Design a protein with these regions (language model features):
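Nucleotide/pyrophosphate-binding catalytic subdomain
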Residues: 1-124
Length: 124
């Protein structure tokens, strides 16, 4: 089975209704014979909201704590997306980058992916 990656940005996952619409695209891809890996952004403007909270903390923006803070939005949307996939009888499992794992260049605020280990994705 061929793998396809579907990426949904913040606007596409900003509400339950919009996530349900995104799931309709996943259903179509599965019907066409694809194994679908979904990548989601934080819901709506969550990342912008988190960045505003850190205004004035420029000295810390290159720390792993800022990356952890900013990833909170993606953790919420990926978990919710997975819940709704399962509600729609599509097996879903949310993963964070460290769980897969995804290896990066360790530039916390603007990382580049070096390697993705796919065995956990393939098992789920």
């Amino acid at each position: 089975m061929n793998i396809i990656i579907k990426k949904f940005g913040g606007t596409s996952v900003s509400s339950i209704d919009k996530i349900e619409r995104a799931i309709s695209y996943i259903k179509k891809a599965r019907k066409a014979g694809y194994y679908v890996v979904v990548v989601v952004s934080a819901m709506g403007k969550d990342t912008d909201r988190l960045l505003k909270i850190t205004a004035g903390l420029d000295d810390y923006k290159k720390s792993d704590d800022i990356s952890s803070l900013l990833s909170a939005g993606e953790q919420i949307s990926s978990s919710l997306f997975s819940i709704l996939l399962n509600k729609n009888s599509i097996k879903g499992k949310s993963f964070q980058g460290w769980q897969i794992p995804i290896h990066t260049d360790l530039s916390y605020y603007n990382s580049h992916i070096l390697k993705i280990e796919t065995q956990h994705i393939k098992k789920s």
